Amino acid sequence: MKILAAMSGGVDSAVAAARAVEAGHDVTGVHLALSRMPGTLRTGSRGCCTIEDSMDARRAADLLGIPFYVWDFSERFAADVVDDFVAEYQAGRTPNPCMRCNERIKFAAVLEKALDLGFDAVCTGHYADVLEGPDGQPELHRAAAWAKDQSYVLGVLTAEQIAHSYFPLGSTPSKAEVRAEAQARGIQVAQKPDSHDICFIPDGDTRGWLADRVGAEPGEILDGEGNAIGTHQGAAAFTVGQRKGLAIGTPAPDGRPRFVLEIRPKDNTVVVGPQEALAIREIAGSSYTWAGTPPTRPDQPFDCDVQIRAHADPVPARAAVSVVDGSVQLVITPRDPLHGVAPGQTAVVYAGTRVLGQVTIDRTVSAVDDARPPMRDAALVGAAAGE
């Protein structure tokens, strides 16, 4: 196959490209320039997408003897990932920028350009696997290295995107093996630390970064009964389930800590309550996709596992496509309550190791009806915020 290897400058993508070459494919390397000002992105142990990363990727491509290019997607990244991140927080939601990047940049804009140029697939260093299903169609599966599995952040891929994706690290049992292989191949970034957190927030201070862009407007912190018990410096910086950073002047009657239950951008308030009030018995959303062949009857309840964070444990659940308040939604009912679920998060559903699909969470139903106020539909929240 003619393969476009996306090379971030890290060890995983370098080894993935090396394996593609070793497998006999016609490989070309590409590094994505995602920032208008690369110097503002993280460098060193916490970084990705910097000028240094571009040079690391070029050196790896030279070692492999493959052509190498840098593609500028900075404008698209700013609009589809960075601006979207800000807008979601302003609407009281909690986005996942890595998933948005996969959905709109790496496996959309980049893949589209690759196919236009005659490539058959895009190769990345993600820990996931593409296997042939019983119907002969490609399926997205978890990686063999469960601790490194990245199928969650790839849950936004469609059947067409999966068919043109190549993940050479999917069957690798551990990251240590990848590093050892890189060392043996003479790849300079063999011991380069993994990147973490959000690449476009230089110091990891999400609250400060957001304040610089949307302002820090003081507001009230409310308890479940609507009583003002504290103040904040900007509701946009909070997320459901958060405990740190709450300036609460009135202690809880039982002396226990309180957590963010809801963000209300319309009146710039944050609602807090006890930890048990975070328990959720149902999640749903209208923005859902299937990763390959959907369930035979998605309108009938089917068994699955649901995962709501990249490194969370999957939870057994039942799911079905239903009409709720006039909109078609994927509704998921976990066997045991989920905790700290925020509008804007992504729920990925699995059948064993296979990714079935994903949904952006718009609505939640509390498992403790009297412990927290009802969470409004995120579409209404966004409308109230002027989105």
Swiss-Prot record:
<feature type="active site" description="Nucleophile">
    <location>
        <position position="101"/>
    </location>
</feature>
<feature type="site" description="Interaction with tRNA">
    <location>
        <position position="126"/>
    </location>
</feature>
<dbReference type="Pfam" id="PF03054">
    <property type="entry name" value="tRNA_Me_trans"/>
</dbReference>
<dbReference type="InterPro" id="IPR014729">
    <property type="entry name" value="Rossmann-like_a/b/a_fold"/>
</dbReference>
<dbReference type="InterPro" id="IPR004506">
    <property type="entry name" value="MnmA-like"/>
</dbReference>
<dbReference type="InterPro" id="IPR046884">
    <property type="entry name" value="MnmA-like_central"/>
</dbReference>
<dbReference type="InterPro" id="IPR046885">
    <property type="entry name" value="MnmA-like_C"/>
</dbReference>
<keyword id="KW-0820">tRNA-binding</keyword>
<protein>
    <recommendedName>
        <fullName>tRNA-specific 2-thiouridylase MnmA</fullName>
        <ecNumber>2.8.1.13</ecNumber>
    </recommendedName>
</protein>
<keyword id="KW-0694">RNA-binding</keyword>
<dbReference type="GO" id="GO:0005737">
    <property type="term" value="C:cytoplasm"/>
</dbReference>
<comment type="similarity">
    <text>Belongs to the MnmA/TRMU family.</text>
</comment>
<feature type="binding site">
    <location>
        <position position="32"/>
    </location>
    <ligand>
        <name>ATP</name>
    </ligand>
</feature>
<feature type="disulfide bond" description="Alternate">
    <location>
        <begin position="101"/>
        <end position="199"/>
    </location>
</feature>
<dbReference type="GO" id="GO:0005524">
    <property type="term" value="F:ATP binding"/>
</dbReference>
<feature type="active site" description="Cysteine persulfide intermediate">
    <location>
        <position position="199"/>
    </location>
</feature>
<keyword id="KW-0067">ATP-binding</keyword>
<feature type="region of interest" description="Interaction with tRNA">
    <location>
        <begin position="148"/>
        <end position="150"/>
    </location>
</feature>
<dbReference type="Pfam" id="PF20259">
    <property type="entry name" value="tRNA_Me_trans_M"/>
</dbReference>
<feature type="binding site">
    <location>
        <begin position="6"/>
        <end position="13"/>
    </location>
    <ligand>
        <name>ATP</name>
    </ligand>
</feature>
<dbReference type="InterPro" id="IPR023382">
    <property type="entry name" value="MnmA-like_central_sf"/>
</dbReference>
<comment type="function">
    <text>Catalyzes the 2-thiolation of uridine at the wobble position (U34) of tRNA, leading to the formation of s(2)U34.</text>
</comment>
<keyword id="KW-1015">Disulfide bond</keyword>
<keyword id="KW-0547">Nucleotide-binding</keyword>
<dbReference type="Pfam" id="PF20258">
    <property type="entry name" value="tRNA_Me_trans_C"/>
</dbReference>
<keyword id="KW-0963">Cytoplasm</keyword>
<dbReference type="GO" id="GO:0103016">
    <property type="term" value="F:tRNA-uridine 2-sulfurtransferase activity"/>
</dbReference>
<feature type="binding site">
    <location>
        <position position="125"/>
    </location>
    <ligand>
        <name>ATP</name>
    </ligand>
</feature>
<dbReference type="GO" id="GO:0002143">
    <property type="term" value="P:tRNA wobble position uridine thiolation"/>
</dbReference>
<feature type="site" description="Interaction with tRNA">
    <location>
        <position position="345"/>
    </location>
</feature>
<keyword id="KW-0819">tRNA processing</keyword>
<keyword id="KW-0808">Transferase</keyword>
<dbReference type="GO" id="GO:0000049">
    <property type="term" value="F:tRNA binding"/>
</dbReference>
